[in-house]
């Protein structure tokens, strides 16, 4: 259904902000305003009485990779770099059979200029990034980040949380969401939140992200569609997201001799 919809908002829920060591507790998808689904991920446990029917992480990753690799499907995230690092760091957990299947899901080569925009399409929706073939399959073939879009539309927004989903949901959408601090008490993590509360919070994040994208994209088309420089800036920001993510995951090589020379 998400593939058929053509665009879907995605959000990860983890037990910490460390994208390498954190546990992927679940994820949310939303492709229709006001309707979202939260998918809890099964956690490894030695307790036979603590097993659940939740989807296993490797199977969840495989299905998400299939969604992300679908040609023409826009995946929308808020602060995408976090979600991308969480998912990319788990690609190695796929079985050989799943890895072989993923190899057959082609994302395709990027169009000229690495952009999906054309002379007739200068909206934010037309400037998503087509990932190059070398990009890991857990990177969407077409990606938009509402946090970056909000920043480009208003780079002078004040406050350290001025681009948070919570703040933008209130100021742009007029929607008040569930407070994270109301769910997770001091000394706890999201893993301690009961499922009936976790799914409401997670699904709400994905729903807000989709609605925010539509609202910001409409504003972008109104204010920036006749400004080629703005279009190029958005295109560039979307292009570098996967690159920066890979750099932060794997590091970069520095020629210390050249730097000290």
Tell me the role of every PLM-derived stretch.
Residues 227-231:
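A short, flexible low-complexity segment enriched in Lys/Arg and Gly/Pro that occurs
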Residues 94-138:
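Intrinsic disorder/low-complexity segments
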Residues 12-13, 79, 181, 258:
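Short loop/turn and capping residues at structural boundaries
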Residues 14, 24-26, 249:
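Short glycine/serine/threonine-biased micro-segments
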């Amino acid at each position: 259904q998400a593939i058929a919809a053509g665009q879907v908002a995605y959000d990860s829920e983890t037990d910490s902000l460390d994208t390498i060591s954190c546990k992927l507790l679940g994820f949310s998808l939303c492709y229709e305003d006001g309707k979202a689904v939260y998918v809890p991920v099964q956690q490894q446990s030695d307790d036979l009485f603590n097993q659940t029917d939740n989807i296993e992480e490797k199977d969840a990753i495989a299905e998400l990779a299939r969604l992300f690799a679908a040609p023409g499907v826009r995946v929308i995230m808020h602060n995408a770099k976090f979600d991308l690092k969480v998912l990319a760091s788990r690609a190695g957990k796929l079985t050989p059979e799943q890895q072989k299947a993923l190899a057959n899901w082609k994302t395709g080569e990027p169009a000229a200029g690495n952009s999906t925009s054309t002379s007739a399409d200068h909206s934010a929706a037309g400037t998503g990034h087509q990932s190059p073939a070398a990009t890991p399959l857990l990177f969407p073939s077409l990606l938009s980040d509402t946090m970056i879009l909000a920043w480009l539309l208003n780079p002078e927004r004040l406050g350290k949380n001025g681009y948070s989903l919570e703040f933008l949901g209130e100021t742009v959408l007029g929607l008040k969401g569930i407070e994270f601090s109301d769910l997770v008490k001091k000394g706890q993590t999201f893993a301690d939140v009961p499922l009936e509360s976790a799914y409401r919070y997670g699904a709400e994040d994905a729903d807000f992200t989709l609605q925010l994208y539509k609202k910001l994209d409409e504003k972008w088309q109104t204010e920036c569609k006749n400004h080629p420089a703005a279009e190029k800036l958005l295109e560039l920001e979307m292009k570098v997201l996967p690159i920066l993510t890979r750099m932060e995951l794997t590091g970069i090589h520095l020629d210390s001799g050249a730097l000290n020379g």
